[in-house]
Amino acid sequence: MKSFHLVFTAFAIAVTTQAIGQAPKRPVPAQPKKQIVSKPVRLTPQPAKPQQATNPVPAAGTAAKPKSPPKPAIKSFPRKTQKLNFIGGDQVLLIGDGLVEQAQKQGYLEYRLMVHNSGKKLHFHNIGWSGDTPAGIARDGLGTRQAGHEPANEGWLQLRKQITDIKPTVAIIGYGMARSLDGSTLEQFKSDYQRLVEHIKGSAGKKNRLRLVFMSPIAHEDLGGKLPSGEAHNIVLEKYREVIGDLSKEHDAWFVDLYRYLKRRKGATTPLLTTDGIHLNEYGYWVMSSAAEFSLNLMATNFRFGIMNNGVERNGGYGIKLGNILPAAKGMTLDGQFDGLPPYFALEKKGKPFTQKTAIGRIQFMGLPEGRYTLVADNVEIHTADAKEWSGGAFIDAGPDVDQAEELRRLLVEKNDLFFHRSRPQNQAYLWGFRRHEQGNNFREVPMFDPLIRQKEEKIFALNKTAKRSYKLMPADDWEKIKPSETAKKSEAIAEAKPFKTQPLPRFDLGEGLEVNLFAQNPHLAKPIQMNFDAKGRLWVASSEVYPQILPGQMATDKVIILEDTNDDGQADKSTVFADNLLIPTGIEPGDGGVYVGQSTELLHLKDTDGDGVADDRRVVMSGFGTEDTHHILHTLRWGFDGRLYFNQSIYIRTHMETPHEVLRLESGGVWRLRPETLKAEIFLRGFCNPWGHHYDEFGQSFVTDGAGGQGLSYGVPGAMYFTYARAPRLLDSVSPGRYPKFCGLEIVRSSHFPDDWQGDAITCDF
């Protein structure tokens, strides 16, 4: 490294023993003796038969292999016989690790519990936290001190306060996965769990009796490839499951045995339930909600009915009340009202694997003449099929009740977003932390989320009811003639750009032989935070309108923008909004067929799967990153020469990351690295104030800049600890200490665009 140049630049059930592959089948009401009842149509897989040990006969001339000792059967926990009754006004606490935290983004669990309680005002408070334990270890960031300087029990104190403020009357607890991965003992987990339950009991609201629900962790799913199989981990998880099951009996709690209900059998062809083996995907959360519904003795809101060609309803129907059945020459009309909104699965592009598993119901029309028929409700198409399919029972997954169900779930997710910003706002260090006096009284904005949450809840309560529908079965050709014209599909809505004038270039003091050109000026570039080029020469930019923190009532509208120079004139002439509705994206790096984006608590991978230039696949790769200071959160994404993805965090951030291999915790600045194909992450470097620059020389050696502390440039030694790391026994000094500006960004020059004597030098910016 010859010299340093300072350059100013402008500028993301399975089959179980209870057969919960979807909502449990609605039982057929008891019938009088000798009454003819149609054979029930099962909406769920048949219950799995107990697996029997087999003793194959060895081939002639071969010795029988010694038998391995049989694996002991896991302990059985009979389902509680009482139904969990909710009471209007219940304050429902959802607390746990990443299992519970990610549930708020799907809304399926809350939705299932809501539709069973139409007319009751239930208030859900999800305070799940990735990497957390019953001791609240991940919550010390809610305190007032800098990361690494808080007392050892700060997380527990903050967890106690959160629970006390909510005053729960129903508590749903979902701990175990993080603890099973961090090397803790079962005895410590049980002790912490007992203490947590006792505090919940002591903090419970007095109006309604406290009801407890304990959820086990899910099983570690074997996804194949280079990910861990989970076999060894499941042995540990079974022990956590047993502890939680025993505690549920001790505390008279409902036990939701997710480990057993969601464990896929080896070789099963059912859809995958997780994204990485330990975190549920959308379908996994839908199945989880079915398991909870079953465990709480809540009858699933699926439906089924059958009608003869003479208009007589067949026995054995459930979930819907029918009336005014009038047969016609080709079809019939009838009225119907569901008992409750259906358990709709909202994943787009479901495909055949989900068709029957996630159907909300099944309808039979017997004795129809040959031909194709369409069923509509309130002039909304439900299903089109031929007479044979209708006679056998058509699976239903559409209609006005489905539309209403999805709207209700959407409102629940939006309410959860508001509560997240209220209970765990970004930029805590400046809201109530040790730097709260530096930016004015921003904390006054936090309670402003409360009325917004109440408004969203009132919409939820009003929508949570079924309506009587007018159904009509008619020839499909007749429907084609009268159905409402399909609204032309609109392109993705983009806010109209405000008129702007070309801005004059600022005056730069340039070195000899250098010039500055304007590459792009774009109204969507609100606050560009990081940018990186891909192999096609396109510039990917993470742009934020929300930074530094979301305001009450503000929507998360941040974007990933692709800028292209298609005619090689040195200026971008094409702009594409690749992704929006992001929350303060602070890091971006193209790769693996899409782009990695650091936003809020997550590292995302966004991908365009249909070739329209817009991301339609969004995957959470890692979560649990701290947000105590939004210019410290996950940033500086860059591919390493070793094929790993590197990314940084700054001094005030506390990260508690659950991976399929282990739980990783970093409560300080530092540099991470991740091998995406195995999801094996590690802390590469610890320390720094604001490590906003990281790059490699031609030998793959790392160099890191610091935006504070006068450290200049540091040589990255794997595993080393640097200035500010609070718990370091020894710190590695910078290679260029001195009174520098606050460095932001780092490039090591290997380009003919720069003079020969710059090659191999480091360039950076002033913050």
Roles of regions detected by a PLM:
Residues 70-72, 146-152, 232-233, 516-518, ...:
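Short, flexible loop segments at the rims of nucleotide/cofactor-binding pockets, characterized by
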Residues 19-21:
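Boundary at the C-terminal end of the N-terminal hydrophobic targeting segment
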Residues 478-767:
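Beta-propeller domains with acidic blade repeats across secreted/periplasmic ectodomains
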Residues 1, 81, 85-88, 107-125, ...:
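Alpha-helical cap/lid subdomain in secreted, periplasmic
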Residues 91-93, 123, 538, 761:
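Residues that mark the start of a beta-strand
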Residues 7-15:
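Bacterial N-terminal signal peptides
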Residues 90-105, 130-134:
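Catalytic nucleophile-elbow at a beta strand-turn-alpha helix junction centered on a G-D-S/GDSL motif
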Residues 23-89, 158, 446-509:
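N-terminal pre-domain segments of enzymes
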